[in-house]
Amino acid sequence: MSKQSSCAIMGKSLSFSLSRGERADLEMPTDPLVLGVKRMMFDRETSTFLLISTVFLNINEKDSHLKILCCNCVSDLRTRINLPCVLIQCRKYNSEAFKYCILLLHNLNRVERLLSFELNHALDENTKIFDGPIVFWQYLNQFFYISSAIGKVTTISLMLSSIEWIGEIENFGLGFLGLAEPSEDKCTQKLSESDYEFSNSSLCAYALKSQEMLSNGYLIPLAYSTMVTHVHVWAAEMVDHQLRTSLIALTRKNQLILFQNGIPVRACQLPFPGPRSVQILDAGKRNRFFIVSFPSKACAVSEKKFKVVAKWEQLSLVLVNDFAGVGTEQVLVVFEDSLDADQLTSFTVTDFVKIWYSTKPLDCCEDPLAEEEHENYYLVLPALEGQLDNSFIFLNKIQQHISFKDKFIAKSWKALLNAVYGKGDSLPSDEMVKLDQDGLVPFCDEGEDSVPTPEENLPDNFPEPEHIVEQTWCHVLDDDLVVGAKVTSLKESNEMTLSLIMNQGNRSSFHLMKCHSQVWLLKHMKCERIQECTEIYLYKKLRNCGALFSWEQRTASEGILTIYCRSQGVLFQCLDHLIKVLPEICSFKYLKVENEDFLVDHLSSTLEAELVTFCSVSTSAFEYVRGGYNCRIRRTDNRAMTFLGRRAKIRQSKRKVQRERILKHLNMTVNGSSYAEMTLALAEIQLKSDLIVKTLANFVIAL
């Protein structure tokens, strides 16, 4: 039996182990190995971890020695869904070749063998699994990787001492960070002042596919990179062909350092030697903590104070997830004496803010006033935030009121001048002074609403200008000023121009660039049109999103945006970005969630309705034909009552025989309108069932 490996997903702890049957004690056992998956969930009422289920999944590897190298919860780039991933080593008895397989756990009853590859050497337990999933390892100073997209082992031809991170870079794609091997002359030189600049970093970024260097700047200065033992990239984005990063580095001097665009911002001295890895815990309300793991030890560093707030020793497992089910993350620390039990007996679950469940006392490193300061901070902060929000709301109302007054005064002044000079314009209606459309700020320039004054000495036959613009608005998005206009004319957009009046002596005009509401989708939301279906946009801003947008234009300044997502988590991420762009008055409507059970139930009911419709159509056609035939027979039967005796019986028998012959050769037809109604009803119900079957098939393929 191999060692036990654990990971966390959706607030549950998953433990993986390999075991055999009853003859596992033989030298070469023949029983097939099974993968045991133990799922545990935290119960807040009892403050304990309870065993939910234990499932054993067969692995078709006979006469082999199996070993779990590592497991991790990674993102499947095919579906953008986080799934538990396990890397298993298989070695046939009396064989020197090593076979490796990557398994994805979709649910408790289904395991997907994603990749299988063979090597002539064994991988150690330091092998890493990244999102993709992508497996990286090092052998004889050479780096290799395999991914689900390539499907084969690929060699990295670069001379690197280590690979610290691999993932998606926003606006670029897959990349990785590696420490370049220092040359001999650099090893003998002393560090100069230029060595401390971020442009001379030996930590470089590379493109995974082409293995070309993206940047060696804005990462880590050379003076720090020689001491780095681990790097965790917080954020990475390609801006104007330059890589911008925020990363956390662990050094040989037992330090945790935060770098932003190559500049060391903050540093913290760690309590234990030999830091190995770091995880980020997001406790909500801008409370983040860095969970640093050591051999059998761990500590937590606050992002705000950049100090150690807790530390633990004699540990066997450290995981970060939403174990309490409150919507924010917590850290699970499992001590050495309880990992193999069905129910964890020694653990700690905390977010260092409000949640703290522990079977052992927490070793805090704060001063004696930290607890009182911590309590007062979270008592005062919500009240201050609420007061600040109310102040912003009050300020917005004042600005709207002042804007309304200015608009009303301008319109009233225009109406007064029109009345003095005998013009027929009246006060604007309520719709003209309504200022809350689309949440945009109205333009109140005098140049737009001005009227000719007597000093201008205009002729009497001067034509009144055609007012084609009913209202104008502006909206600031990042560094751009977006101007919207509600037009009343039916002219084409290429016949219009938009003028920006800075002052009376400086006026500039330019052609109308966009007359629809799709600019924000393409630029600010970073969407891309699908060539095969131009009305659908692919949302590419999030690296783990994979959402589709459908924009239906209603008016020049109004439309309906439909979002198609594969999960609720992706939907929340899309809404988080949309709220920053959309106006405040827009409304949201949650349509429906189509899971597998819903589709199966809907399909069964639709098939039942299809069967009932088919039966009713057949019955209606038969009743129509039989009704016409019965009318013909009924007229013949009325004359049969006049005959008596034997002659009447003979004729009655003769008519019965003739009736059967007519029934055999009868052309059973219905009229056109009845047939069309029956066929249409049957076609509609069959179309519904076919659409549900297609949706269910796509759902199964996505899983």
Swiss-Prot record:
Its main location: nucleus. The keyword DNA repair applies. GO terms for biological process: bone marrow development; cellular response to camptothecin; cellular response to xenobiotic stimulus; gene expression; hematopoietic stem cell differentiation; interstrand cross-link repair; negative regulation of double-strand break repair via homologous recombination; positive regulation of double-strand break repair via homologous recombination. Disulfide bonds: none annotated. It comes from the Eukaryota. It is found in: Nucleus. InterPro entries: FANCB. GO terms for cellular component: Fanconi anaemia nuclear complex. Keywords: DNA damage, DNA repair, Nucleus. DNA repair protein required for FANCD2 ubiquitination. Belongs to the multisubunit FA complex composed of FANCA, FANCB, FANCC, FANCE, FANCF, FANCG, FANCL/PHF9 and FANCM. This is Fanconi anemia group B protein homolog. It comes from Mus musculus (Mouse).
